[in-house]
Regions:
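Glycine-enriched alpha-helix->loop->beta-strand junction motifs that scaffold or abut catalytic
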Residues: 79-85
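Solvent-exposed polar/charged
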Residues: 29, 78-79
Length: 197
């Protein structure tokens, strides 16, 4: 939807990662090479003439953080990322997340290993905790009651129905609590510290 706002045509999901990969290949050269170089974009409509940057990054290159769930995104993350946000391919329910996340994480790490790299994973669950489960659910209800309805609908429309693979398996109706629509759609942990642990 955002691309339409700027009058752009939607670019195919996998091609977007290929284009980003080309950009980061060039950035790695800019960060690491000591001689100027020229480059004509193959997938992107840009060129670099006698390019260089100074000063160079102090630690080789800035860390790159991505979020992905698709094969094309996983390949991009394996080649370029240092930290990868992952969502549960099984949806927001903790049982399905615990069942599907280990293989999903192993896939990403193994792909990075094939490129001679290591990546770290970050899972961002929704945690709503209070002294008792009843208090936690009441607090989650309060969050839900205070959410902006139009923004939440737009978020759900743009993510649940998009071509973003990370949201596959997540629907507005399968969330344990609708608080996910207010503060995200990842794994939901709602309860007392004892029940969450």
């Amino acid at each position: 939807v955002e691309h339409e706002m700027f009058g752009w045509q939607r670019i195919d999901h996998d091609k977007r990662y290929d284009m980003a990969g080309e950009l980061f290949d060039v950035l790695h050269r800019l960060w690491g090479e000591t001689e100027n170089f020229s480059y004509e974009g193959k997938l992107n409509p840009w060129a670099i003439n006698s390019g260089w940057i100074t000063p160079k990054p102090a630690f080789g290159r800035p860390p790159l953080v991505t979020a992905t769930g698709s094969p094309a995104g996983i390949d991009f993350a394996a080649r370029h990322s240092d930290l990868v946000f992952v969502t549960s391919p099984g949806g927001a329910h903790i049982d399905s997340a615990l069942e599907t996340l280990p293989d999903h994480i192993a896939t990403i790490k193994n792909r990075a290993k094939a490129y001679g790299r290591q990546v770290k994973m970050l899972i961002n669950p929704i945690i709503v905790s209070r002294d008792t489960e009843r208090e936690a659910i009441a607090y989650a209800d309060a969050i839900e009651a205070g959410k902006p309805q139009s923004g939440t609908r737009a978020f759900a429309t743009n993510n649940y129905d998009s071509d973003a693979h990370a949201w596959r398996g997540h629907t507005a109706t399968d969330l344990r609590h609708s608080v996910g629509g207010a503060i995200g759609g990842n794994v939901q942990l709602i309860g007392s510290p004892e029940t969450i642990a």
